[in-house]
UniProtKB/Swiss-Prot annotation:
Family note: Belongs to the Aux/IAA family.
Induction entry: By auxin.
UniProt entry tagged with the keyword S-adenosyl-L-methionine: no
Name of the protein this chain belongs to: Auxin-responsive protein IAA32
Source organism of the structure: Arabidopsis thaliana
Highest taxon, organism lineage: Eukaryota
């Protein structure tokens, strides 16, 4: 303990009585080392003398951007503004329950969900799926490449399994229900 600390520093606070014990001889404090929290000293200035927030009114009055403006900026950056506006209403809530689609990799028990509104094309979808599942394979997924051992298939709302990339992106996003990353030799088998 700091020798400059007054001996009655811990006397006034009842919250330290279980962690510190005073001796009868010297009136000093023995640290029992039982505290798991840090000691927070009182403020040096009383509340009446606190420093004002003059000049910081602009920061305090600054409003957070709305969800719609963020969605619009995001969709303008990726080039799929119309698609993003179709999935969100004015309150920012998802209108379509198919904005998030579950993706499973053969051999893994747990699947993951992907937001198709955040993707602008098949290439960005393949990159995100490679980031999610690529570490589970020796050579990565390499989806949509001829030398890949994996194929990406999807089930549409009618329950028919199809190859991803056979239809235009917008039609794919509107009809997809679930996706599966299958080994190429397994992709030929009926589901």
């Amino acid at each position: 303990m700091d020798p400059n600390t007054p001996a009655d520093f811990f006397k006034g606070s009842s919250k330290f009585h279980t962690y510190y014990s005073q001796t009868k001889k010297g009136g000093g404090v023995i640290d029992l080392g039982l505290s798991l929290r840090t000691i927070q000293h009182e403020t040096y200035l009383p509340p009446a003398r606190m420093i004002g927030l003059d000049g910081y009114g602009e920061l305090i009055d600054w409003s957070q951007p709305s969800y719609n403006s963020i969605t619009q900026l995001k969709s303008e950056d990726t080039g799929h503004q119309r698609l993003a506006q179709g999935y969100y209403n004015n309150e920012g809530e998802s209108r379509g329950k198919y904005a998030y689609v579950k993706v499973n990799l053969d051999g893994l028990v747990v699947g993951r969900k992907v937001c198709l509104v955040d993707q602008g094309a098949y290439a960005t979808l393949a990159l995100q799926l490679n980031d999610m599942f690529g570490m589970q394979t020796v050579s990565g997924l390499r989806l949509f490449q001829t030398e890949s051992e994996f194929s990406l298939v999807y089930r549409d709302r009618e329950g028919i399994w199809r190859n991803v990339g056979d239809v235009p992106w917008k039609e794919f996003v509107e009809s997809v229900d679930r996706m599966r990353i299958a080994r190429r030799n397994d992709a030929l088998l009926p589901f």
